[in-house]
Amino acid sequence: MAKISTQYSHPTRTHPSVRTMDRDLDCIENGLSRTHLPCEETSSELQEGIAMETRGLAESRQSSFTSQGPTRLSRLIISLRAWSARHLHQEDQRPDSFLERFRGAELQEVSSRESHVQFNVGSQEPPDRGRSAWPLARNNTNTCNNSEKDDKAKKEEKEKKEEKKENPKKEEKKKDSVVMDPSSNMYYHWLTVIAVPVFYNWCLLVCRACFDELQSEHLMLWLVLDYSADILYGMDMLVRARTGFLEQGLMVMDASRLWKHYTQTLHFKLDVLSLVPTDLAYFKLGMNYPELRFNRLLKLARLFEFFDRTETRTNYPNMFRIGNLVLYILIIIHWNACIYFAISKFIGFGTDSWVYPNVSNPEYGRLSRKYIYSLYWSTLTLTTIGETPPPVKDEEYLFVVIDFLVGVLIFATIVGNVGSMISNMNASRAEFQAKIDSIKQYMQFRKVTKDLETRVIRWFDYLWANKKTVDEKEVLKSLPDKLKAEIAINVHLDTLRKVRIFQDCEAGLLVELVLKLRPAVFSPGDYICKKGDIGREMYIIKEGKLAVVAEDGITQFVVLGDGSYFGEISILNIKGSKSGNRRTANIRSIGYSDLFCLSKDDLMEALTEYPEAKKALEEKGRQILMKDNLIDEELAKAGADPKDIEEKVEHLETSLDSLQTRFARLLAEYNATQMKVKQRLSQLESQVKMGLPPDGDAPQTEASQP
């Protein structure tokens, strides 16, 4: 009976004890063998011995402790040497966190066992008396049992690290969200808010400074409004400091850079000056001096910015420009009226005929009369329409001269701006009317019938009434191709998807076709196509009613409405079609109809880049013809159409002619250049033989001089 020196008493079982120890050694060896072995050369002899012994054991099939003991011990020594060498010369490497995300449960369990085996083998704990004589096997058994707990702890640590990595990103996003985009709706709404206190200060500060009753009778109201405006001014500085700007096409979102950029602009200086607390002088001078707050007028740029943004956003820019111009004129007249009343107060009311009448008169002592009289005088002076009392003193003459100059500028501005606005508003109508006039003259010159002339004029009236006179290509030509494509997709893509043969096409082909759709408008009674005509276009009905009629043009078979389409088979040029590319029906417009047209040439040009889509479209068209029994199978299998071959040959001949022409031109240029080079070489040879310098370097002799 095999005995093991341990302090515990065990039953006399030989094979189970050997198996358990073998299993423990396997756990250790499997764990340590997964590590890198830098000292494999030093243990090669032991490995050879182990290999010989394992071969003998495999043949004999013996599993006793006496026969396998040396082999197990040798393996254990090799594993310990490899581990100690790696531990001394190489640091522990943490597995890649990115790869750990893709590990399965088995790989994670194996890796956890590795780490625990290495840890327990490397620990130099003194053996206890109550423990087994195989501490390594005991340690390995314990680590295998505790692997799940360690895996959970590792997962928790990884989650914490990932959260720490994600938290800065979230904080950066929060910081970026505070930055305001100057092209966003939020920024425009803030401009609307800040424009109110700016407009309030520009209109009422000067009025309160000139008319004392207005300031004294509503003092609390003005204090509330003034300091509310100051709060908005302060908030506007914060908004400006957090407003992004473009740098190399990208929006700058860094708060420190935004603040530095803002402090370097003129707006920052004006904003600071507009918030200087000059109204603290109220405590010394009194509350009836609102002119102390005139520094709040430095915020005028915000009002102009609001007007500019509104002009670009509104759908009626011409009307907005006219209203904006009238507002500027009213503000100038308002300021001029207040200054006139202030000058009259400085000179003395009623001292002469030019100043404001004496306020001792109850009729002229009212606040409303004071302002209206001053406004009336200012309007007459600036518009130079009516007559006003002549000035008497030098100060009055100087003020009137300045008013006349300002009035002339205002009058010129009004005439110029209003004239240009009206011309811009009527530009489209004038251009459209010019087209009608030219067509009328042509029809009169060619003596067109009255019926046809009436139809033409009605067609033009329909276009103008329904705002369909806009040339889309002319309007969109200034846009880049990307924006053109997006507008066309937004307008026409849903319409094109209704066509049966285009429903499963790839998006790139649909975009190409959308850009090639052309609008077409037909009058009542117009034939879109007739039976037997060559089909060069397909049509999609956007709005209106079309009728499939008989040869007489009256009998209606089918009425086509919005979203219907026809002619899609004829532009595909499918082989074996019984009708060829001919129209098979008469289609007539019942009323005014708006259609989209796609030509055969445009379709084929788009399909050159999509050969697979071309095959798919032809197959769909062939299936449609087969359902309607409109395809000849023999012709379809016969091969290429002779007409197509003739067209290709003609195209090749044309290309060959153009290439020959280009080659002849290039050959002539080459011969001419070669001739010039030969002449130049001959001249140089003759000069060298005669011993003369080249022409450009020949000195002028006295004989050559005049």
Curated annotation (Swiss-Prot):
InterPro entries: CLZ_dom (IPR032406), CNG_cation_channel (IPR050866), cNMP-bd_CS (IPR018488), cNMP-bd_dom (IPR000595), cNMP-bd_dom_sf (IPR018490), Ion_trans_dom (IPR005821), RmlC-like_jellyroll (IPR014710). Ca(2+) influx is inhibited by extracellular Mg(2+) ions. Residues 384-387 are annotated as: Selectivity filter. Residues 113-177, 685-706 are annotated as: Disordered. It is a multi-pass membrane protein. One of its GO terms (molecular function) is calcium channel activity. 3',5'-cyclic GMP binds at residues 567-568, 570, 583-584, 628. Testis, kidney, retinal cone (at protein level) and heart. The C-terminal coiled-coil domain mediates homotrimerization of CNGA subunits. This is Cyclic nucleotide-gated channel alpha-3.
